[in-house]
Amino acid sequence: MTAQNRFRDTEIRASRGTKLTAKSWMTEAPLRMLMNNLDPEVAENPKELVVYGGIGRAARNWECYDKIVESLTHLNDDETLLIQSGKPVGVFKTHSNAPRVLIANSNLVPHWANWEHFNELDVKGLAMYGQMTAGSWIYIGSQGIVQGTYETFVEAGRQHFGGSLKGRWVLTAGLGGMGGAQPLAATLAGACSLNIECQQSRIDFRLKTRYVDEQATDFDDALARIKKYTSAGKAVSIALCGNAAEILPELVRRGVRPDMVTDQTSAHDPLNGYLPKGWSWEEYRRRAQSEPVLVVNAAKTSMAEHVEAMLAFHHMGIPTFDYGNNIRQMAQDMGVTHAFDFPGFVPAYIRPLFCRGVGPFRWAALSGDAEDIYKTDAKVKELIPDDEHLHHWLDMARERISFQGLPARICWVGLGQRAKLGLAFNEMVRTGELSAPIVIGRDHLDSGSVASPNRETEAMQDGSDAVSDWPLLNALLNTASGATWVSLHHGGGVGMGFSQHSGMVVVCDGSDDAAERIARVLHNDPATGVMRHADAGYDIAINCAQEQGLNLPMIAATQGRKA
């Protein structure tokens, strides 16, 4: 098998309503979510199976996609489909409470876990980059990261600006599937933003979906707009078509002072995701095929200049942070020895949430009916009545976020809350309040499901940044708990060799059996995050574990000795 069958001039959309294509909702759900990942409203390049994040794909090639669809259509509720890097490799008899699909994407033996070896396998058709939610079939468009980015900006505002970002502006780059969330997140947090993107098509997509408000005609126009809006205290997002490796150094030379600096280009993948300065996108794609080593070097050289500019802002005292694309590592590889002087966003702003199992809980309406999402929004408010911040997020999301593909919602909630919400949603399906089942999943970027020393597990207080037993245990436990599909990936977010991570999705079809699975999965999944952080010695996590009654033998022993 080769990688050649990766283009098909077609459009895919998931079925809507209650008519089944597969044999049950347990198999209809992964089928619809696979197709939803490739909906033109959702995916970055669906005709080549690319969902987001450089070359993050939903299936290895179109032949594999067709066989996955065929397998899911005929799969029984006591069988499990195995997916190996986007290729359906087996169907096995299991049982009704086992996952219907088990997915392993992009995993390599550590010595060979690098882009060079992966790209060789990719060209031969032996591997597929699954990113995080591309190959695990639970991507919901840019909304999937909006709240996490919003929470980051809000916390940065608390730490650096007295709790308000009014009249402030964020400098960043990248308007792809993940980076496209930044302008809207900044606006929702009360800040202006200047968002640099080298592909006009991506700017057009974000303008169309209302994730970005305006496009500047050129560099000077962008700065003039920023000055106008910040002076008026307005939160407006501005896109600028250009190369960050050229624009950020120029801003430094001019003495321009943003209030916050970050980046979400696809720097994790220098061959496919970061345009070298001075190159056109067409040249970049052409030479990636004929001169991959030269292209990687050129991209990383530009990243080094990009990071040098970020360091200059950092040394000016401007809050500057990596937003999880591994650009600091790429720059360090090119000789920028102090690349890690500015922090990643997780240790800087998010880790206290992870210690309580709080993370990106998401759900999608298989009916295709937006009213089902609005009803679940109301249920979240009803069941979590005192969280004004969460209510504000849900109100803003309804007002500002356009659904992409099947209607979906994300909100950050933690241990105890997730199971409560899942069971309530299942009951809403049972009573007919929702018109069809829903699926509940999450990003792999979560409390207990990832090992990524340059992102989610950066600067762990016990030094366990690179220990990847935790996402493996998370995947095993979600499988044992009865998630509908479970995934285990390598390289998402930060690229080959730098992360391992797992995901899960559970279906709410209104049945008693589903309720039992939901209760197990949506408790155990965030509980592994509390466990992981408690094991690392975080007091917030230890206290949460005690409050939630988690049985963590070594934590109990440690606390007993302290007493």
UniProtKB/Swiss-Prot annotation:
Specify whether Electron transport is a keyword of the entry. no
The UniProt annotation places NAD(+) binding at 53-54, 131, 177-179, 197, 202, 243-244, 264-268, 274-275, 323, 493
Q: Where in the cell is it found?
A: Cytoplasm
Report the cofactors: NAD(+)
Q: Name one GO molecular function term.
A: urocanate hydratase activity
Q: What's this chain's function?
A: Catalyzes the conversion of urocanate to 4-imidazolone-5-propionate.
Protein's name according to its UniProt entry: Urocanate hydratase
